[in-house]
From Swiss-Prot:
Protein name, as recorded: Putative L-type lectin-domain containing receptor kinase V.1
PROSITE patterns reported in the protein's UniProt record: LECTIN_LEGUME_BETA, PROTEIN_KINASE_ATP, PROTEIN_KINASE_DOM, PROTEIN_KINASE_ST
Keyword Cell division applies: no
Glycan attachment positions: N29, N74, N123, N176, N204, N259
Gene3D superfamilies: 2.60.120.200, Phosphorylase Kinase, domain 1, Transferase(Phosphotransferase) domain 1
Lineage of producing organism: Eukaryota, Viridiplantae, Streptophyta, Embryophyta, Tracheophyta
Species annotation: Arabidopsis thaliana
Extracellular face residues: 19-289
CDD domains recorded: lectin_legume_LecRK_Arcelin_ConA (cd06899), STKc_IRAK (cd14066)
Signal peptide bounds: 1-18
Topology of this chain in the membrane: Single-pass type I membrane protein
ATP-binding found in the keyword field: yes
Binding site for ATP: L350, G351, K352, G353, G354, F355, G356, K357, V358, K373
Keyword set, alphabetical order: ATP-binding, Cell membrane, Glycoprotein, Kinase, Lectin, Membrane, Nucleotide-binding, Receptor, Serine/threonine-protein kinase, Signal, Transferase, Transmembrane, Transmembrane helix
Molecular-function GO terms, alphabetical: ATP binding; carbohydrate binding; protein serine kinase activity; protein serine/threonine kinase activity
Length: 666
């Protein structure tokens, strides 16, 4: 397929022809190829100004021709990549405007749409309508509770609505993982990259200052197939709005490419941003504005003094700790959490873990359901380390991981705010009759969901994350019975290919691997061991150790292995499943569970191999029974963590497993 490449290079003079050959396809520039509407215009230097000093207005610019995003009406969306340089400058020293949105839409005429908070994309009646076929990335500089905004300086990915699928504070990640925030309406030029991978079904958004190289870690990453949302032919462009207060929204340069990485923009060739013209000072409106400003300053001074006196008398002083500088934008007000949980009443307790109680709640105004974990601030140093982990893990976004929304500190207590899982934890379904029974298809899907989340932690994120406490109580189910791995209170981080540091043995009895109990060194293989136990537990409907059971059935793995040796492995299945199960799937789960929970760490598969086996892409070794019967630790294979997570292969004919830490697209 011929690649379509257009370069909207705004520094190219208008006399240049509008189309010319290019080694990568067809190249375009601004001459005659841009469609403007509303307050938008393009000056002689190619600078786009979307909005001006006119209040309650919308400015939009689109590439004049439609682009083919699909090969057919029902086809899949092709990969695409775009980058642009923008600047947002407020007027008269007052923050105004509502930001910029890069938009992919089926028409250049989005009317009737509203300015202000709707960014010229939607109106009240068509918000959330699947017929919109709009995908946008918003650079939002205003807070609007109806769109679940948490701050006035964020970046979000929007699909058919301004309630973002995923959102983050504006900023960028350095190579060492440190987060640096940016102020979108600072007037400084910034560059943003929006890249969609059709194979991974993933869209990444990366923001950075103009003269800083593109970061390796994206600000936003969303796994979503865009094929149901985009049509075969679509327009691409920008939209921006103002309210009663105004701002200038500029696009200095823009490139876009289908099926490849778009070329970078040369900052030295970008047009200059003009200073905002201020003839208003000499006008009656200008005099009135100055008078109101002076009066406002006097009132502000009086209010500031009153506030200072109030804070001086306040007994409780919240000190901003180091870790909060990075995680601060996600801080919740204690008042909101207190209202949401009805004053942290015992009737709202969902459960109690190793770090504290978990409460259910509903946030005021937005009515979003949340789960709040209360953590005692017993050890300052311990809490600092714990939150350093949480701050990093809070950036994770995966459909099979419970999302950490933010935190709150109040009177020495720490509160972690998570998405609320409507169905609760998996152990309640396995062991509490009143919760309801799980059929085989639900159990198999839960196993695959947890495997997907664990694979992301081990091999797909920029760092290796070792969960260290995988068990049914930490597997949560949403309203649609989708499983999500949660409770990262014991999780550890390390770089790909490095050796996790030894620490105290953490986890739950029955799920701790032999090498972890001996050395105290957790690894991805010790997580795989616990996952294998959980697989058996889901299939058999019983705990890994039953002290009061017969000697034969006391240890789950021993019992399953014995039944396999006696060629009657199906007898271990949970009797509540009945006869409604797929025998091949059940056998795979039981045998793979024994494989993953093998006492020798080096023999266990990694999670990418587990995914292949569960998806029937690969087959279990034909001699797997002989392998799992080898219960002793052979010389040279007593693995604690180093060898288990090294990039070397562990070959088990006819299937070869390789621990390969790959950072996809990072």
């Amino acid at each position: 397929m011929v690649l379509l490449l257009f370069l909207v290079l705004f520094f190219v003079p208008e006399s240049v022809v509008c189309q010319r050959p290019n080694p990568n396809g067809v190249e375009f520039n601004t001459s005659g190829n841009m469609y403007t509407s509303g307050s938008a215009y393009i000056n002689n230097n190619g600078l786009i100004r979307l909005t001006n000093s006119t209040p309650q207005t919308t400015g939009q610019v689109f590439y004049n021709d439609q682009l083919r995003f699909k090969n057919s009406v029902n086809g899949t969306v092709s990969s695409f990549s775009t980058t642009f340089v923008f600047s947002i400058e407020f007027h008269n020293g007052i923050y105004g405007g509502y930001g910029i949105a890069f938009v992919i839409c089926p028409t250049r005429d989005l009317s009737p749409t509203f300015p202000t908070t709707y960014l010229g994309l939607f109106n009240r009646s068509n918000m959330g309508d699947p017929k919109n076929h709009i995908v946008a990335v918003e650079l939002d500089t205003k807070v609007d509770q109806q769109f679940e905004d948490k701050d006035a300086n964020h970046v979000g990915i929007d699909i058919n609505t301004l309630v973002s699928d995923t959102v983050a504070l504006a900023g960028y990640y350095m190579d060492n993982g440190t987060f640096r925030s940016l102020l979108l309406n600072s007037g400084q030029p910034m560059q943003i990259w929006i890249e969609y991978d059709s194979k991974q079904k993933q869209i990444n958004v990366t923001l950075h200052p103009l003269y800083v190289p593109k970061p390796k870690i994206p600000l936003l990453s969303l796994e979503k197939d865009l094929s149901p949302y985009l049509l075969e032919l679509m327009y691409v462009g920008f939209t921006s709005t103002t309210g009663d207060l105004t701002a200038s929204h500029y696009i200095l340069g823009w490139t876009f490419k289908m099926n490849g990485t778009t070329p970078d923009i040369d900052p030295s060739r970008l047009p200059k941003i003009p200073r905002y013209n201020q003839p208003w000072i000499q006008s009656p409106n200008g005099i009135l504005t100055i008078s109101l400003t002076v009066s406002g300053v006097i009132i502000l001074i009086i209010l500031s003094l009153s506030l200072w006196l109030f804070l001086k008398r306040k007994k409780l002083l919240e000190v901003l700790e180091d870790w909060e500088v990075q995680f601060g934008p996600h801080r919740f007000a204690f008042k909101d959490l207190h209202i949401a949980t009805k004053g942290f009443k015992d009737t709202e307790v969902l459960g109690k873990g190793g770090f504290g109680k978990v409460y259910k709640g509903t946030l005021p105004v937005s009515n979003v359901e949340i789960a709040v974990k209360m953590v005692s601030h017993d050890s300052r140093q311990g809490m600092r380390e714990f939150i350093a982990e949480i701050a990093t893990i809070g950036r994770l976004r995966h459909p099979n991981l419970v999302r950490l929304q933010g935190y709150c500190r109040h009177k020495g207590e720490l509160y972690l705010v998570y998405d609320c899982m409507a169905k609760g934890s998996l152990d309640k379904f396995l062991y509490h009759q009143q919760t309801g029974n799980l059929d085989w298809s639900q159990r198999f899907k839960i196993i695959k969901d947890v495997a997907s989340g664990l694979y992301y932690l081990h091999q797909q994120w920029v760092q290796v994350i070792i969960h260290r406490d995988i068990k049914p109580a930490n597997i949560l189910l949403d309203a649609n019975m989708n499983a999500k791995l949660g409770d990262f209170g014991l999780a550890k981080l390390c770089d790909h290919g490095t050796d996790p540091q030894t620490s105290h043995v953490a986890g739950t009895l029955g799920y701790i691997s032999p090498e972890l109990s001996r050395t105290g060194k957790a690894s991805t293989r010790s997580d795989v061991f616990a996952f294998g136990i959980v697989m058996l537990e889901i299939a058999c409907g019983r705990k890994p150790i039953l002290p009061r059971a017969s000697q034969r059935e006391m240890v789950l793995t021993d019992w399953v292995l014995e039944c396999w040796e006696n060629e009657d492995i199906m007898q271990v299945l949970d009797h509540k499943i009945g006869q409604e199960y797929v025998e091949e799937q059940a056998a795979l789960v039981l045998k793979l569970g024994l494989f993953c929970s093998h006492p020798v760490a080096a023999i266990r598969p990694n999670m990418s191999s587990v995914i292949q086996l569960l998806d029937s892409v690969a087959q279990l070794p034909h001699n797997l029974l002989d392998i799992v019967q080898t219960r002793e630790v052979h010389r040279g294979t007593e693995i604690s963590g180093e060898a288990a997570d090294s990039p070397e292969s562990c070959s088990i004919a006819p299937l070869t497993f390789t621990e390969s830490f790959v950072s996809h697209g990072r």
